[in-house]
């Protein structure tokens, strides 16, 4: 997984789609992508793990605890782009549903060799694989 290329792809996609506010879903303890993207965008980091949120805040990220199975929709007000790095396959439909509820673009950087869930388009970028869904206009 090449963090530099992942950041480059998300940044390029966000700029091309005029995304101002973005959210990383399921940040866990991997903060590299969010920290870099927060230099360019209003970014929030989301996870269900309280310790991950505390660590993200210590690193200067705007981080919030939330549950994908029962999301607090108000956290995602004005979010233009949701992205997630290597989320478990069984969580991906919930991430897609959330992006639809808030009408946000979606980028998922999957684990390798996963089949995309319906409605997501496969995109290869400099050796990295992404699934994307553009928001409805």
Curated annotation (Swiss-Prot):
Gene3D superfamilies registered for this protein in UniProt: Vaccinia Virus protein VP39 (3.40.50.150)
InterPro entries, sorted: SAM-dependent_MTases_sf, UPF0146
Pfam families according to UniProt: UPF0146
UniProt cross-references to NCBIfam families, sorted A to Z: PRK04148.1
Family: Belongs to the UPF0146 family.
Record protein name field: UPF0146 protein MJ0688
Species the sequence originates in: Methanocaldococcus jannaschii (strain ATCC 43067 / DSM 2661 / JAL-1 / JCM 10045 / NBRC 100440) (Methanococcus jannaschii)
